[in-house]
């Protein structure tokens, strides 16, 4: 049976892991969200999130955005190639509803997969 959990091994945890993604990434972006990714040696994708206070002032809003993105990753992890992915949130995402964020991030997962495979 397929597991849809978001365990510790599916996260980027250390600054070194984040830094490696920024070195020479594959990019997929929209006006509000950018995905940066590099291939990893694991058998699964890993996710790191950054939601800057500069763009989203309130903590509850930052947490909401991270929760929606994590949930989308959790449900789509088996369709995403073995990549280390960092999600950067920019200005404008705070005004979006959860469903809009989810739709946008799923579109970006597909775009990233195409760029990696194609």
Swiss-Prot record:
Q: Which GO terms describe its biological process?
A: tRNA 5'-leader removal
Q: Does the keyword Nuclease belong to this entry?
A: yes
Q: Which domain of life is it from?
A: Bacteria
Q: What is a single cellular component term in the Gene Ontology annotation?
A: ribonuclease P complex
Leader peptide range in chain numbering: none
Say what the protein does: RNaseP catalyzes the removal of the 5'-leader sequence from pre-tRNA to produce the mature 5'-terminus. It can also cleave other RNA substrates such as 4.5S RNA. The protein component plays an auxiliary but essential role in vivo by binding to the 5'-leader sequence and broadening the substrate specificity of the ribozyme.
Quaternary structure per UniProt?
A: Consists of a catalytic RNA component (M1 or rnpB) and a protein subunit.
Write out the similarity annotation.
Belongs to the RnpA family.
Q: What is this protein called?
A: Ribonuclease P protein component
Annotated source species: Shewanella sp. (strain ANA-3)
Q: What is the lineage of its organism?
A: Bacteria, Pseudomonadati, Pseudomonadota, Gammaproteobacteria, Alteromonadales
- Name the gene behind this protein: rnpA
């Amino acid at each position: 049976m397929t597991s849809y959990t978001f365990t510790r091994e599916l996260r980027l945890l250390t600054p070194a892991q984040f830094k490696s993604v920024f070195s020479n990434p594959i990019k997929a972006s929209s006006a509000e969200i950018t995905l940066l990714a590099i291939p990893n040696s694991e058998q699964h994708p890993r996710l790191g999130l950054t939601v800057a206070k500069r763009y989203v002032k309130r903590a509850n809003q930052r947490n909401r955005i991270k929760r929606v993105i994590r949930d989308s990753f959790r449900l789509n992890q088996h369709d995403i190639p073995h990549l280390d992915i960092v999600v950067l949130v920019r200005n404008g995402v705070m005004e979006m509803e959860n469903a809009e964020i989810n739709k946008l991030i799923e579109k970006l997962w597909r775009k990233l997969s195409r760029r990696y495979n194609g």
